[in-house]
Amino acid sequence: GRDGYVVKNGTNCKYSCEIGSEYEYCGPLCKRKNAKTGYCYAFACWCIDVPDDVKLYGDDGTYCSS
């Protein structure tokens, strides 16, 4: 697996979060995407040990089409 920002399906946008709320929000979010865990980094959810088939920010460029 790899580490990185997970993105919303179809938009390539990061999941924004607030520092301090990371474990209530980012941890479960990352686990739903089959990552080991995650936390809030630079106002977005950063996931640890993400499976290779899960798209991360940067895989399709950094354009966010919300």
UniProtKB/Swiss-Prot annotation:
Gene3D superfamilies documented for this protein: Knottin, scorpion toxin-like (3.30.30.10)
Q: In which tissues is it expressed?
A: Expressed by the venom gland.
PROSITE patterns, alphabetized: LCN_CSAB
GO BP annotations of the record are: defense response
Which purpose does this protein serve, as stated in its record? Beta toxins bind voltage-independently at site-4 of sodium channels and shift the voltage of activation toward more negative potentials thereby affecting sodium channel activation and promoting spontaneous and repetitive firing. This toxin is active only on insects. This toxin has very low anti-insect activity.
Q: What is known of its domains?
A: Has the structural arrangement of an alpha-helix connected to antiparallel beta-sheets by disulfide bonds (CS-alpha/beta).
Identification of the protein by name? Toxin Aah6
* Organism of derivation: Androctonus australis (Sahara scorpion)
Output the lineage of the source organism.
Answer: Eukaryota, Metazoa, Ecdysozoa, Arthropoda, Chelicerata
